[in-house]
Amino acid sequence: MPASGMLFANDHDAGRTFIFDLRDPLHPKIVTSFTEMAGYLHPHSYLRLPNDHVLATFQHEHYGASEEPMGSTGGPVEIDDQGKVIRSASNADPAFAGALLTPYSLVVLPELDRVVSTNSSMHLDYIFAGVTYQVWRLYDFKLLKTAYFDVGENRYAQISPEETRLGPDGSIFVQTLGCGLERITGVNTDEPRSRLVYTFPGNWCGVPTIGGHYLVQSAGAMHGLIVLDITNAAKPVEVS
């Protein structure tokens, strides 16, 4: 629970986010709700920043009633606990005009002044179209880099990059819907890199958890969980 007692809860399909005041847990109340923020729609992931504001990934730009309602790009939006927009940025990148750029998850690295976000769609028509990640400067939301994920031997494990997790060594692990585990390094350099370091069985993997030097991943193909030892982050080892 955030120290402020304010909880953001998202109904993604409806595109509406609710902010709950839980400072009195037995008498919760809704402070406000929102759909569009700073010209963006359909938020997906939320993280607390060091200043206690919330940074959210919005999947689509809102074009307005006279045009197509949702754009093919979105962006990060910083929001306070009252639902006020603090700042925002577009993740559009002219060098990747043909790529799907709908922000999905993100990880914040305050000590490096960086944010890393993934691009993956929640819409079934485009659910297997995402293959990129983006690196931002935290203090002003400047987009520094858009890059493709590493492609493995099976040619699909990099598809639909979803959840970002900060590893114990400071690198970033990304689970994909294609059941790959990508590792991003060098985000504070001009040339960040991703490497496919593990491939789980099947596909439709989601929502990994890191505890200590272990990464736990659900694997639908085996109806169970796989635990990796990521002490050597470049070469995870299955231990359970």
Language model segments and positions:
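Beta-rich, blade/repeat-based domains predominating
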Residues: 1-3, 37-50, 95-114, 151-171, ...
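Conserved beta-propeller blade signature
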Residues: 6-9, 54-55, 114-116, 171-174, ...
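Beta-propeller domains
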Residues: 1, 9-30
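Short, solvent-exposed loop/turn segments at conserved positions within beta-propeller repeat blades
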Residues: 12-15, 64-73, 124-130, 157, ...
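Short loop/turn segments immediately following beta-strands, especially the blade-tip
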Residues: 19-28, 78-86, 135-144, 183-192, ...
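Loop/turn-rich, solvent-exposed surfaces of beta-rich toroidal or solenoidal domains
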Residues: 203-240
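Beta-propeller fold detector
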Residues: 29-36, 86-93, 143-150, 193-200, ...
